[in-house]
Amino acid sequence: SNRRVYCIQKDKTGYMWFLTHEGIDRYNGKEFKRYKLMDGDAEVNSLLNLNWLYIDQEGVLWEIGKKGKVFRYDQIHDCFSLVYKLPMESFSEQPDPVTYAWLDQNKHIWLCNKDTIFLYNTDTKQVTHIKNDISEEITDIEQIDESHFFIGTEMGIHYAQLENNALKLINCDKLESVKAQVSDLHFDKKIRKLFIGTFLRGIMVYDMNTKSVIRPDYNLKDISITRFKPLNDKELLIATDGGGVHKINMDTYQIVPEIVADYNLSLI
């Protein structure tokens, strides 16, 4: 695929799925197949409809856009089906009512904006409206357990509990002291540490065991962090915007380059 790629997922068969500016491509190891997203007879190909790609715990692939349309991959018919869309008449002044979408471990798709969180239950297909008491644009979410979450925003990070269809903010002085635009979060349940990637403020770590925020000595503070990915039991890969790929030791917090490019465009 030579198209611009926004998201990549690998399914249980081993196929690679790429969300691009023209739709969804699947690579089976030999060839690419393109999938169109259809709303009735109309193809959904606006960039406001091609934003997030997730695979749930049962291996089902989901695509979500900023206009609030949710597509589910139908393996039997080998196509994507539109299963839900936000009523756009409620957002006549907002062309993109969803600023962030996320799939949790409780079979809920979160459709978030500054005022409201819409929870779409992938089993029952019911939608619950929850007031966003954070009143900030959500940029990433990590689930701690059945009902507790770390929520990153354009202003910082919050600790919250989702219970009885309400999002309750829980005071955490150390986390509230983190004032930065959060770009990515990674929570390791085994060691109970939250790795926080930011826009031009580097990397921070919140240790739930000691209730402290650690700032590594070398923390890539002049580089924007785009993604964390586990490398092994002890290390995380760190993708950056323009600074190559690094890795961090989750015990010592030492950060070292993993993949960087030289001026001859070769990899080191």
Regions inferred by a protein language model and the residue ranges of each:
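Carboxylate-rich, polar loop motifs that coordinate divalent cations or form catalytic acidic clusters
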Residues: 1-268
